[in-house]
A protein has these predicted regions:
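C-terminal helix-loop subdomains that flank or include functional centers
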Residues: 292-305, 332-503
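Polar/charged side chains located within well-ordered beta-strands of beta-rich proteins
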Residues: 7, 17, 194, 199-201, ...
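Extended, regular secondary-structure scaffolds
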Residues: 127-240
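Short amphipathic alpha-helical segments
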Residues: 112-120, 127, 329, 333, ...
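Extended, helix-rich architectural segments
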Residues: 1-158, 480-484, 488-503
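Short secondary-structure capping micro-motifs at structural edges
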Residues: 119-124, 321-325, 364-372
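Extended, charged amphipathic alpha-helical segments
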Residues: 219-357
Length: 503
C-alpha cells in the first residue's frame, strides 16, 4: 500500500480528505514564514513590495502604519549577492553524452524552451534565497496524439517547487518516500477572476501519484512504476537538524531587519528632521504685543507660524543622533549580509587586515563555491537519472543512464583566474616610478594581496627584503618580472597556475 492511499480512499463528503490535504509538516509550519521572506527578498516582491514585511511600532496608528508601508523602500542586496554566486557557478559548464535525445532535452527541459542551465539557475536562486527548493521530474500521463505526435514526442519535463509549496513529506533510509505539494488551479479565461486562495494538491510516493482540486475531490490518479519519488531537493547548505530542508545563504530575518531600518530612517528624516522658529519676547509682553509680533513676522519674514516665548528669536532643531544611529545600524546589517555570503561590503585598508584574515576570506569563499559546484554536479546527474527512469520503465533507468555516458563538469577554481589581472595592476603601479618609498609600499601591498596565505615569518622576511632594497636593486620591476616572480612563489608552494608552463 502506497503512502498516499489513505488520502485517496478518505471520504470527501465529511471533509476528512480536505482536512488531510491541508495538513502540513511541523517543520513547514515552523519555517514557512522565513522561507517566504527569503523568496520575497530575492525577487523584491511580496511583503517587500507591499510593505507587509514592516514591523509596526508599538504605539503606531493604523493610518501611520499604512502610510509607512506606502513609502517603504527596499534595497535588493539579496539578488545582487545570489546572482554573483550564480554567475560564478554556471560559467563554463560542460555537458557530454552519447545520447542525442538527452542532448535535445537539455535544450528544453520544461516544455517552454528553457535550457537546463537556465532552469538550474532559477532553481538554485530560490534554494540560496530560502534554503532549499524542489525539482519535480514529471511526464504527461498519456502520449500526445494527432499529426504532431512525431514532432512532439512524449518526454519528461521539469517543474521548480518553491519551499513554500512543499507542504508535507516523508523521508526514510532510502531517501524521499512521499511528498505533497500545492499547485495553482488551471488557468482561466481573461473574463474570469482568479482566486489565489483556490489551490489544488499533487501527491507522489514511490508507486503512484494523485491530484486533487481545491475542493478536495480526486481529479486524476496514476501508477508511475519508477520505484522512487521523482522529486529532487536542492539544498546548498543542508540543515543539521532537519534532513529535508536547508539554510539560506543570507538569513532572511536580517534582510527584513535592514528593510525596517530604512523605513525607520525615513520616518525620522521626514517627520522629525525640521526646524522650529522660536521668537522670544520680554516677560512683560501682553497679548497685543504678541499679536503685533506675529503680524510683523508675516509682513517681513513671510510666516506667522512661530512659537513665541520670552527672550530672543532663535531656531530650534531636532536631535539628529537618532538618524545617525539608525544609519550606522544599516551599515552594520549590510556588512553582515555580505559576510554571510562570504564577501566584504567595504574593503578595509590592506594594512588593517592581517594576511591570515585575507587568506581565510578567500579560502572560505572558494570552498563555498566549490562545494556548491559539486552539489550542482550531483544534482544535475540525479535529474538525468530521473529522466531515464521515465524513458525506460521497468527498472532499467540506471542501465540507460550508464549507456548514455553522461558527464557534467562544473568549474572547480574560482579565485585563481584573477591572478593575472592582480599582477598586471600591481606591476603597472610599480612602473609609475613614484619614488623609492612609494614603490616599496606598493610592493609590500602587492605581495600581501597576491600571497595572503604566506606564513608570518615568510611574509616578514619578504617585507624586510623590500625595506632593505635600494633604488638600483630592481624596485621598479616591470610587469613580466613581477608576474614571473609571483608565479614562481605560487608553484613553490604547490599551487598550479594556468599558463605557467608557457611562461
Amino acid at each position: 500500500m502506497g503512502l498516499i492511499d489513505g488520502l485517496v480512499v478518505a471520504s470527501n463528503q465529511s471533509g476528512e480528505r480536505k482536512r488531510l490535504l491541508q495538513h502540513t509538516h511541523p517543520t513547514y509550519d515552523l519555517y514557512r514564514d522565513l522561507w517566504q521572506v527569503g523568496l520575497d527578498a530575492y525577487d523584491g516582491t511580496g511583503g517587500f513590495l507591499t510593505g507587509a514585511h514592516l514591523w509596526a511600532f508599538p504605539r503606531e496608528t493604523g493610518d501611520d502604519y499604512a502610510k509607512r508601508k506606502h513609502h517603504a523602500r527596499y534595497h535588493n542586496y539579496a539578488e545582487t549577492l545570489i546572482d554573483i554566486y550564480l554567475r560564478h557557478l554556471t560559467t563554463d559548464v560542460e555537458r557530454e553524452t552519447s545520447d542525442s535525445a538527452l542532448k535535445d532535452w537539455w535544450m528544453d527541459v520544461d516544455g517552454r524552451g528553457t535550457p537546463i542551465l537556465s532552469f538550474l539557475q532559477g532553481a538554485l536562486g530560490q534554494a540560496l534565497a530560502a534554503g532549499h527548493a524542489g525539482v519535480l521530474v514529471d511526464k504527461a500521463p498519456t502520449a500526445p496524439t494527432g499529426p504532431s505526435q512525431a514532432e512532439d514526442p512524449e518526454r519528461p519535463f521539469l517543474v521548480v517547487l518553491p519551499p513554500t509549496s512543499i507542504l508535507d513529506w516523508r523521508v526514510d533510509r532510502r531517501g524521499l518516500a512521499a511528498v505533497k505539494v500545492t499547485e495553482a488551479t488551471p488557468a482561466r479565461g481573461l473574463g474570469e477572476v482568479d482566486d489565489p486562495e483556490k489551490t489544488g494538491w499533487l501527491l507522489w510516493d514511490r508507486q503512484q501519484w494523485a491530484r486533487f482540486d481545491d475542493s478536495g475531490s480526486l481529479s486524476a490518479r496514476g501508477v508511475h512504476k519508477l520505484g522512487v519519488v521523482p522529486v529532487e531537493i536542492l539544498r546548498p547548505k543542508p540543515s543539521r537538524q532537519h534532513p529535508f530542508i536547508g539554510k539560506a545563504l543570507i538569513t532572511p530575518s536580517v534582510i527584513q531587519a535592514l528593510y525596517n531600518r530604512a523605513s525607520e530612517e525615513d520616518v525620522v528624516l521626514r517627520d522629525q528632521a525640521f526646524s522650529l522658529f522660536v521668537v522670544q519676547v520680554p516677560t512683560e509682553a501682553t497679548a497685543d504685543d504678541i499679536e503685533l509680533v506675529r503680524r510683523s513676522l508675516a509682513e517681513g519674514v513671510g510666516t506667522s507660524t512661530v512659537t513665541i516665548i520670552k527672550g530672543t528669536a532663535d531656531f530650534k532643531t531636532a536631535n539628529m543622533e537618532t538618524a545617525a544611529a539608525i544609519r550606522a545600524n544599516q551599515q552594520y546589517l549590510i556588512a553582515e549580509i555580505y559576510r554571510m555570503a562570504h564577501l566584504r561590503f567595504q574593503r578595509e585598508s590592506l594594512e588593517a587586515e592581517s594576511a591570515e584574515a585575507v587568506r581565510l576570506q578567500r579560502q572560505d569563499l572558494d570552498q563555498t563555491l566549490r562545494s556548491l559546484a559539486e552539489l550542482l554536479h550531483d544534482f544535475e546527474l540525479a535529474i538525468a537519472r530521473r529522466y531515464y527512469d521515465w524513458q525506460t520503465p521497468g527498472g532499467q533507468g540506471q542501465a540507460a543512464f550508464d549507456r548514455a555516458k553522461v558527464e557534467v563538469r562544473y568549474p572547480t577554481e574560482f579565485t585563481m583566474p584573477d591572478l593575472e589581472a592582480e599582477l598586471a595592476n600591481w606591476a603597472s603601479a610599480i612602473a609609475l616610478q613614484l619614488g623609492e618609498t612609494a614603490t616599496k609600499e606598493i610592493r609590500k601591498r602587492a605581495v600581501f594581496v597576491l600571497l595572503p596565505d604566506l606564513a608570518p615569518e615568510t611574509m616578514g622576511a619578504i617585507t624586510r627584503e623590500i625595506d632593505s632594497a635600494k633604488a638600483g636593486d630592481g624596485l621598479a620591476s616591470n610587469a613580466n618580472d613581477l608576474r614571473q616572480q609571483a608565479v614562481q612563489r605560487l608553484q613553490a608552494r604547490g599551487i598550479q597556475v594556468a599558463g605557467a608552463e608557457a611562461a
